[in-house]
UniProtKB/Swiss-Prot annotation:
Coiled-coil regions listed: none
Compositionally biased tracts (Basic residues): 256-266
Source organism of the structure: Rattus norvegicus
Protein name: Non-structural maintenance of chromosomes element 1 homolog
A GO term from the CC aspect: Smc5-Smc6 complex
Compartments reported by the entry: Nucleus; Chromosome, Telomere
Taxonomic placement: Eukaryota, Metazoa, Chordata, Craniata, Vertebrata
């Protein structure tokens, strides 16, 4: 079997198809990545034993290393869902988006990024972003056009929109963390628990330390009276639930069952 005789660091058609499809999507949640992996095995090597996802991705990364590309794993800041993105390590700046967006569109993203990083909440309002349209480099852009470009950023999973405000998608954080740290050293916020870049989260009202929502959920998971890990003062915020992939999977199965039932009834 190809799966059992393959040497480490060599890509098969299974790996190549997986990589090609991941490149098409840009970023996927972990359950989607597992489904994609199984699909690629069924298409190219039906009889092989499916590698553990971590080993499978490590194998691809060992080949991509010389190209300065890597499949990186992260989590969504709002609810802790594991995600995977194909990251270009050769350039950390906004310029890595240049193949999909025009110069003035990239500059709009930079303006939005700066507002998001500078904000206390990790969000920038569409009004504040659109007010900077006159300052864009390159071809002039009307506000109506800028609104459409912001939606393109959302569709491409660079930004997330919630009630007229924008924040960074997990894909943007995975791809641009180094660039953000270097470009906005005075505005950058770090999580006190995982020590990685924090865009949105909770903060201690006494000492000011910040924590990602998923880190808050895990840290205070079995604590009746949550206290700040730094100053030990009372933690005044609501504690979010820890993301449970099994519960999510069951909800997905239930949802698809209801959908198929509705389809049969029509």
């Amino acid at each position: 079997m190809q799966g059992s005789t393959r040497r480490a660091g060599a890509m098969t058609d299974v790996h190549r198809r997986f990589l090609q499809l991941l490149m098409t999507h840009g970023v996927l949640e972990e359950w989607e990545v597992r489904r994609l992996q199984n699909h690629c095995y069924k298409v190219h090597d039906r009889n092989a034993t499916v590698d553990k996802l971590e080993d499978f991705i490590n194998n691809i990364n060992s080949v991509l290393e010389s190209l300065y590309i890597e499949i990186k794993k992260g989590i969504t800041e709002d609810d802790g869902r594991p995600i995977y993105a194909l990251v270009n390590l050769a350039t950390t700046s906004v310029s890595k988006m240049a193949t999909d967006f025009a110069e003035n569109e990239l500059d709009l993203f930079r303006k939005a990024l700066e507002l998001i990083v500078d904000s206390e909440t990790g969000f920038a309002s569409s009004t504040n972003i659109l007010n900077l349209v006159d300052q864009l480099k390159g071809k002039k852009m009307r506000k109506k056009e800028a609104e459409q470009v912001l939606q393109k950023f959302v569709q491409s999973k660079w930004l997330i929109e919630k009630e007229g405000e924008f924040t960074l998608h997990g894909r943007a954080i995975l791809e641009m963390e180094q660039f953000i740290r270097e470009s906005y050293p005075d505005a950058v916020k770090m999580c006190n628990i995982c020590h990685s870049l924090l865009i949105q989260g909770q903060s201690c009202e006494t000492c000011g330390i910040r924590m990602h929502l998923p880190c808050v959920a895990k840290y205070f998971q079995s604590t009746a009276e949550p206290r700040c890990p730094h100053c030990n003062d009372y933690w005044p915020h609501d504690i979010p639930e820890v993301f449970d992939p099994e519960k999510e999977r069951e909800a997905g199965i239930s949802k698809s069952s209801r959908k198929s039932l509705r389809t049969r009834q029509h």
